[in-house]
Amino acid sequence: VAFLSLTRILKVHYSVDIKLRDSEIKPVDFKFKDYKTWFVDSGLATIMDSKLDLSGIELELKTGFLKVLESREKLKLAKKNRKITRALLVSEAANYDFGIGEAGDLFEALIIYTRVLSGYYDSVYNFNLSTVELNRIKSKGTANP
């Protein structure tokens, strides 16, 4: 009877606590939770105090900030989903290695994990894109990004 052992083929020991290697795709650092804090920290408050008129882009700034917060929440959800499906894949691989799992279940878990991982990378991309867009809107009102 043919027996496929992923641990022997890939030369990697699987466990539920396995750490994935960091990829080059990472979300940017955006620590702000509320608009006022971001507005002051980004230097826009001092510009508002000066004679420059930011009233034309203030709505764009608020909308852009809300998009960043929304995409960050989607990113958090995608990160949780990735962790859950990784655990499913590891358990299916272990079951298959022990001879109690079926090949179909293992490949189905692999397909699910691949789709969820792709969704995670999409979420990272959308989050990074929304922060860049917010920075672009901010730079319209100021001379510096």
Locations of regions flagged by a protein language model:
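Short, solvent-exposed, mixed-charge loop/turn linkers that connect secondary-structure elements
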Residues: V1-A45, T131-P145
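Amphipathic alpha-helical coiled-coil segments
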Residues: A2, T46-G119, N126-I137
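Juxtamembrane helix-loop transition sites at the ends of transmembrane segments
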Residues: K19, F32, Y120-N126
